[in-house]
Amino acid sequence: MSDQPHTLRYLANCSMLFTEEPLLERPRAAAAAGFTAIEFWWPWPDNPTPSQEEIDAFVTAVDDSGVQLVGLNFFAGELTGPVDAGVLSIPARSQQFRDNIPVAVGIGERLGVQAFNALYGVRVDDSTPQEQDALALENLGLAAEAAARIGATVLVEPVSGPKPYALRTAADTIAVVDAVRAAGHDNVGFLNDLFHLANNGDDPAAAVAAHTDKTAHVQIADYPGRGEPGTGELDLDALLAQLQEQGYDGYVGLEYKPTTTTTDSLAWLPTARRA
């Protein structure tokens, strides 16, 4: 990547980066690396409603580090396992998502979270796509109502990989964003994950051109491989410059799998450009 083709701010996804450290030490590690802003997947992948003690420990770890928690996932199951990729569209697990909403938003209220990522989930055999989509619309509406109370946004993203995730393209995802907005929830936006789009064969540049006005957050990793920028073939500089030219001024989440240590994988990014 070149020196500075754009001025967008980068933040560290502490569920993918700094995994050399225990989860509660990662905010401090991100701060030591020069970041002032971070994001996390849901910290308890097996539990949508952790104990107050667990919640307080997480909040304290972020507070004490001095970094801003900008983004947090709602409960989505075990994302690194073979099955889970969100629960909000799955009838048998919908209640887990609903139970998680006030917990996640409560953490967000304490830490100033600006955006909550709501992973849609996979297609299941015991429900039709239409039934799943209707349930998802209802649950995303509930999430948006709760997030709105603290001035936050709900994000919806495409996901790639072998799991039968329902939203594969930018068009798939924008259709959901539009449906939730049409139901009266304006605080729902597109999470443009440039890696997932490329990995699914969607055109990231076309998605930027068509959907920047509905883009509420951006995440990057290089393609192929999902490594740090410079390890693949995506022209991330050009894509991010295009986003900024079209009016995007939010954060860029670094959600990649380091091919070396996290610190060494950040060599491409001068400390001064870390959010």
Where do the PLM segments sit?
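Histidine-acidic metal/acid-base catalytic patches
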Residues: 1-34, 112-113, 137, 141, ...
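A cross-domain feature marking catalytic cores of carbohydrate-active enzymes
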Residues: 14-16, 40-44, 69-76, 118-120, ...
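A generic structural signal for short coil/turn motifs at secondary-structure boundaries
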Residues: 47-48, 127, 162-165, 226-230
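N-terminal pre-domain/capping segments
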Residues: 1-105, 109-113, 241, 255, ...
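Active-site acidic/histidine proton-transfer and metal-coordination neighborhood
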Residues: 3, 64, 81-189
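Short C-terminal domain-edge/linker segments immediately following a structured domain
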Residues: 40-45, 69-73, 100-104, 145-150, ...
